[in-house]
Design a protein with these regions (language model features):
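Thiamine diphosphate
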Residues: 1-124
Length: 124
């Protein structure tokens, strides 16, 4: 696929929705991997996909710093793969409270439309 989405946990359904929107709006092929767990990462599959993809996107319901996306970056760097990565997740700072997760995600760039815009910008 042109773009590979690697999602963890509660972000898997979000990744499928993002893949559908991204493919419809860009005409690119978009794949989704349910990573199931952060460690150990499936390095063989990640490296294989990254070598043929234009972009890798990780989606996690946790801090991106030191999280699943960082593990993906380290894995690719260790294999000499330079495919760009977009890490979608929570910022490395205190995240306030909200009445619902949709509001909280929107406040931190993680609404469906915001994630789509972030990925599309990375493809330019």
């Amino acid at each position: 696929a042109d773009v590979q989405l690697w999602a963890l946990g509660t972000m898997v359904p979000e990744a499928h929705a993002l893949a559908d929107k991204l493919a419809a709006e860009t005409g690119l092929s978009v794949g989704v991997v349910n990573a199931r767990f952060a460690k150990p990462i499936d390095a063989t599959l990640l490296v294989e996909q990254a070598r043929s993809a234009k972009l890798i996107v990780t989606l996690e319901d946790g801090a991106v710093t030191g999280g699943f996306g960082t593990g993906a970056l380290e894995t690719l760097a260790g294999h000499g793969v330079r495919t760009p990565i977009v890490r979608l997740g929570w910022p490395d700072r205190f995240v306030g409270h909200a009445t619902d997760v949709k509001t909280l995600r929107a406040a931190h760039g993680l609404s469906p439309d915001q994630m789509l815009a972030t990925v599309k910008a990375a493809l330019k």
